[in-house]
């Protein structure tokens, strides 16, 4: 087992480049299954374990997938199987995104119930509601979701009870080959939705309204492979913005898109952080003293739940009382106990957390509880006295590429070691060939 060891106290400075967006590339890779002609080529693909997992799912289904030099090439023109087994899907809940493409193309999909981060109840009922509205018969049992339709899916009007990103993506992918027109109301508006729509349209789909509350999809008879470059990762960008702020540093986050980060920029500026838009990204300059603020997570364009734990780390250093309210996911405060191990004055009240700052953070041995919590604990370590040791790095590797190396290049005192010996060891990278 590996751990990251960080000694706090260093101000970060320099430039860090943002990778392609994990939450955009996964549905785009799933969507390549829709192409019955040609090969799809995707650029700026981050070298993450989740990308490897969904690529393995596609290979199991019958697609030919090659990954090298931040590029994924998929040929799914041959026959596909309809079942994605538990051994793959358990690793990552985004694997359920193959369901829409399989149902649209083959008329049947059998997918194991998903895994991924253990963040409370993350039901997929909205996905299934959409499939049923388009004429599919859906059954859930024995750890699997079975969906089947006679002939083609039919266009339908679908209202989502909550603007779920995954449901919006899955229904979009199912609808592009459906007979007739599908309208998705109260859909997700995230930049990753727009990116998926752009990819689908480049394949020959007719998707309109992505980025608004209503998406209209006119079904087509076939889709063709295309070339696509994934948008930059706004959550990785936000994480490095917080890293600059928590250390009082001066960092240019190269590739950060201001339009994708409006709510985060607003909260950082409210805390006294300087954010400057430059030609290649965003420069973030941390103040000597941070101000307390209140945050409520909301669907985009509201404050992203995926930045909640990182901002919690930052608010531990702010003067005054702050409150964070989580409205998107249940049980996303598991990292609070780990912050307490670092001397954080923090308590949970229902779906909110109360922080009394500034806290004199102290280095401690802590365990990551999910992907974003892993990054947040490292951020807290950057501002703590002494050494912080973060374990359960499998969570971190699902969403960040060479995270400790990027921080070290900015001046952080950080290394990744084997737990048994604590000898410095370079991160084990996935072999992206084959």
UniProtKB/Swiss-Prot annotation:
Record localization: Cytoplasm
Gene Ontology BP term (one): cell wall organization
Keywords linked to the UniProt accession: Cell cycle, Cell division, Cell shape, Cell wall biogenesis/degradation, Cytoplasm, Peptidoglycan synthesis, Pyruvate, Transferase
Residue sites binding phosphoenolpyruvate per the record: 22-23
Pfam assignment, any one: EPSP_synthase
Residues annotated to bind UDP-N-acetyl-alpha-D-glucosamine: 93, 122-126, 306, 328
GO molecular function: UDP-N-acetylglucosamine 1-carboxyvinyltransferase activity
Catalytic activity line of the entry: phosphoenolpyruvate + UDP-N-acetyl-alpha-D-glucosamine = UDP-N-acetyl-3-O-(1-carboxyvinyl)-alpha-D-glucosamine + phosphate
Main location: cytoplasm
GO cellular component: cytoplasm
Pathway: Cell wall biogenesis; peptidoglycan biosynthesis
EC number: 2.5.1.7
Highest taxon, organism lineage: Bacteria
Cytoplasm is among the record's keywords: yes
CDD domains named in the record: UdpNAET (cd01555)
Transmembrane parts of this sequence: none
Record flagged with keyword ATP-binding: no
Annotated positions of the 2-(S-cysteinyl)pyruvic acid O-phosphothioketal modification: 117
SUPFAM superfamilies: EPT/RTPC-like
Protein family according to the UniProt entry: Belongs to the EPSP synthase family. MurA subfamily.
Protein name: UDP-N-acetylglucosamine 1-carboxyvinyltransferase 1
Gene: murA1
């Amino acid at each position: 087992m590996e751990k990251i060891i960080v000694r706090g106290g260093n101000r970060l400075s320099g430039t860090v480049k943002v990778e392609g967006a994990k939450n955009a590339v996964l549905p785009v890779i799933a969507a390549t299954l829709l192409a019955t002609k040609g090969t799809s080529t995707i650029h700026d693909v981050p070298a993450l374990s989740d990308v490897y997992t969904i690529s393995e799912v596609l290979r199991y289904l019958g697609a030919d997938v090659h990954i090298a030099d931040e590029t994924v090439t998929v040929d799914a023109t041959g026959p596909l199987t309809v079942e994605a087994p538990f051994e793959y899907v358990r690793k990552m809940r985004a694997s359920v995104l193959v369901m829409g493409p399989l149902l649209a193309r083959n008329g049947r999909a059998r997918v194991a119930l998903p895994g991924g981060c253990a963040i409370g109840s993350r039901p997929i009922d909205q996905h299934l509601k959409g499939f049923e509205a388009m004429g599919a018969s859906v059954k859930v049992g024995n750890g699997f979701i079975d969906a089947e339709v006679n002939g083609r899916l039919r266009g339908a009007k679908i209202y989502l009870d909550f603007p779920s990103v995954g449901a919006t993506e899955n229904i979009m992918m199912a609808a592009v080959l459906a007979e007739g027109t599908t309208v998705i109301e109260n859909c997700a508006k995230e930049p990753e939705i727009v990116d998926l729509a752009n990819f689908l349209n480049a394949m020959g789909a007719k998707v309109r309204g992505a980025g608004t509350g209503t998406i209209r999809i006119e079904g087509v008879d076939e889709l063709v492979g295309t070339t696509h470059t994934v948008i930059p990762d706004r959550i990785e960008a936000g994480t490095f913005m917080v890293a600059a702020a928590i250390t009082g540093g001066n960092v240019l986050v190269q590739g950060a898109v201001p339009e994708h980060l409006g709510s985060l920029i607003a909260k950082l500026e409210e805390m006294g952080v300087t954010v400057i838009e430059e030609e290649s990204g965003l420069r973030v300059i941390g103040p000597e003293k941070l101000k307390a603020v209140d945050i409520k997570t909301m669907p985009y364009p509201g404050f992203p739940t995926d930045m909640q734990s990182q901002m919690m780390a930052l608010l531990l250093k702010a003067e005054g009382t702050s409150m964070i309210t989580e409205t998107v996911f249940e049980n996303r405060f598991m990292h609070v106990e780990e912050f307490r191990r670092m001397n954080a004055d923090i308590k949970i009240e229902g779906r909110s957390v109360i922080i009394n700052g500034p806290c004199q953070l102290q280095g401690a041995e802590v365990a990551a509880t999910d992907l974003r919590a892993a990054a947040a604990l490292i951020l807290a370590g950057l501002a703590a006295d002494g050494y912080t040791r973060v374990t359960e790095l499998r969570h971190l590797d699902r969403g960040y590429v060479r995270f400790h190396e990027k921080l070290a290049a900015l001046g952080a005192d950080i290394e990744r070691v084997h737990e048994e010996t604590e000898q410095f060891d370079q991160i084990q990278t996935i072999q992206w060939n084959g």
